[in-house]
């Protein structure tokens, strides 16, 4: 693998730290000021300049791309902890208190989800109580389409993959990452099992071997919630 390709990937993702020599690398707490269009409109550029004054040997302040929190702009990520509707005083307080870990909000956990009928449909599909034809008919009748831009009918997509002979996998893009998109983070932080059950239903329908979930590093809260809840289910 050419070093140029490694460098290309490493410099593309904002959460990689590029250093000239690993011997000189000093792990620090990184403070990232979102510089998306929305945050810029709410004064992110001036905020970045002000917060730069807080830099020391343990704190590094850098700009960062859209963090999926456009509804609470401007936002600043202190370590893994987000300061929403941020200002200098709020960020300084968070740094002084060494509050670097992600905040975990109240959400629907696996026991609460199951009490309200969660995973019943997935289990019925897995056990054949609900047939693949019934699933396909429901998808087609609903008119559900992909949200990635092409608007491809979900039922047709599942049918094509289901008929494929060979190893199959479900790959879930947890967030598209474009500016203004915070709907994914919002429901994943509040109702994660609706998402997980949907992934399982897709995997049972196409007879997938595994489900892979991609989640951007800007969503540490979602990552922790999903890991904790998946561990409970295992």
Residue ranges and their predicted role:
Residues 1-234:
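Feature of Fe-S/electron-transfer and energy-metabolism proteins
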């Amino acid at each position: 693998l050419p070093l140029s390709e490694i460098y290309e990937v490493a410099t593309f993702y904002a959460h990689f730290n590029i250093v000239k020599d690993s011997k000189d690398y000093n792990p620090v707490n990184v403070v990232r000021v979102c510089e998306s269009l929305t945050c810029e409109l709410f004064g992110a550029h001036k905020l970045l300049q002000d917060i730069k004054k807080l830099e020391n040997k343990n704190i590094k302040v850098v700009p960062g791309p859209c963090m999926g929190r456009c509804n609470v702009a401007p936002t600043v990520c202190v370590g893994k902890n987000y300061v929403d509707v941020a200002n200098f005083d709020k960020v300084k307080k968070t740094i002084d208190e060494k509050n670097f870990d992600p905040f975990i909000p109240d959400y629907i956990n696996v026991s609460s989800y199951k009490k309200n009928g969660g995973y019943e449909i997935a289990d019925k599909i897995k056990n054949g109580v609900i047939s693949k034809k019934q699933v396909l008919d429901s998808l087609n009748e609903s008119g559900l389409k992909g949200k990635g831009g092409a608007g491809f009918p979900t039922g047709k997509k599942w049918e094509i993959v289901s008929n494929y002979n060979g190893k199959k996998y479900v790959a879930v893009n947890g967030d598209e990452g474009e500016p203004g998109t915070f709907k994914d983070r919002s429901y994943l932080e509040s109702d994660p099992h609706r998402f997980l059950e949907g992934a399982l239903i897709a995997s049972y329908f196409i007879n997938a071997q595994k489900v892979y979930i991609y989640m951007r590093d800007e969503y540490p809260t979602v990552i922790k919630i999903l890991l904790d809840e998946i561990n409970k289910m295992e």
